[in-house]
């Protein structure tokens, strides 16, 4: 008898011992009309479908050239010949976009509009169908009058090619109020696991909510029951539908609603996959996180993954790089979102909780956008090592408080001293005054800008001379708001204008008194980014007796007549070129600050000016880090 049992087990195991491709992930999809697809398929839904996203035809469909049981590129419709868009469409699209390139994703979708969950009870299906209306009977015929059996047969065939990695369910409208629904779903789920020789730990069940109450869902009360499903099935996860737009009948989703819901199914599956060994999904905590916090995380494609616990919130968004991403909440009150691939470098971001913009408590904060903001660093490759700390001598960034006679107030500036400053007590150093941009402050260059690491690395490599770098507030922390009835250009000229007296009458004298500096113009430079570039021009050009090096990075310098501006300082090119030891203008290729046009105008006048373009960057900190790296090696070598 034991031999017979062993033989039967071996035969059973042999059924599934196909040459499965572990990199072909297959998902079984079932449910009623919202899984079947009720929304019209739009042009965007049929374009750019990745070759790695496949569907197995659940029925013959001659008009589409599809044969039951065969794999095809997953161009909708995915269910039957004339069904609409489904959550499975954007579930699969999102997975192949986020997963490694060697992973394929396949879906098998068997769904019947208007059905109860009992339709997927294989043993009692025929009895159940007999009591249903003719239209439902006709749909069931497409699946041989037993949708469960059809799904199982297709799944067995699919297992010859790949590995079943999950089950997607969207059903419940026709079972609204049925408190036994979770147990009925459990029966279907366990039957599939048994019949396909699957383990629950490897094949989670993802069940979507029906149209939410926030969309006036007619069956929204069913969501309370759906959310108890994990109590019946520990490996079940509920996909929230809040914020997914509903159709006019308030039973089905719009195409946009299906897209959002499909992405949410995918987001949940990706989160689960991250925990699996050898999943190929790699994310790392952002370097800008507070130590000990795992989120936000960044993946190899540059996407940022956010989590935020706010069980009482009704709506959350992430505002990052000028785009707002809706977050979605699970049953435990944990909100998640994933961005599109972001440019490398530093980016401010905010969480918007029920309309209120707040910082992320998991992230360090940075002063930017005229307020304290969260920030995230999307890492560069080795080309970004110049602004990362290396095994070289490190300087210091000091916070210095001083009294401003011109403003009658105490102020703070940040001062970088090179690594050798303490060990060479008799040596004096040149000074670079370095300004931030609009809506930022004196901390910007040493936090967002990584100025100290850039300087340490350049000095250690011998590319630039040791120097002090002084950063003060440009008095432009608050937004620019012209007064009503005033000329905007005149108002703009006043924005941050208090800084000009501060730097000339308070800051430079204080630095020269406090630190071992070389105090002549030949050893003093000034540069700034954006509005700091504007302030650099306004400070240096009228006072060339105090500065001999000038830099502007994406300078906010507009509407100047190069021949007449600043009392005609550029009119006599020979005089200017002899007076200024080095003149630098830089910007990113993706921004429109007019820098190149200004350079062309200056060169036509005979002005010697170096021009640098940061490839692929816009008005952002990566541009300015690169500009600083290009600028400082030219200082104080004349």
Regions found by a protein language model. Give the residues of each.
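Catalytic nucleophile-elbow at a beta strand-turn-alpha helix junction centered on a G-D-S/GDSL motif
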Residues: 25-85, 113-116
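Hydrophobic h-region of N-terminal signal peptides that target proteins for export
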Residues: 9-18
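Conserved catalytic region of serine esterases and O-acyltransferases that act on ester linkages
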Residues: 23-25, 256, 260-284
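Extracellular serine-dependent O-acyl
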Residues: 107, 204-209, 218-248, 260-272
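Conserved SGNH/GDSL esterase-like catalytic core that processes O-acyl groups on lipids
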Residues: 62-158, 176, 214-219
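Non-catalytic cap/lid and distal C-terminal segments of serine-dependent acyl enzymes
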Residues: 32-41, 48, 120-121, 131-138, ...
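Positively charged n-region of N-terminal signal peptides that target proteins for export
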Residues: 1-4
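Active-site segments of SGNH/GDSL-like serine hydrolases
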Residues: 168, 173, 195-220, 470-473
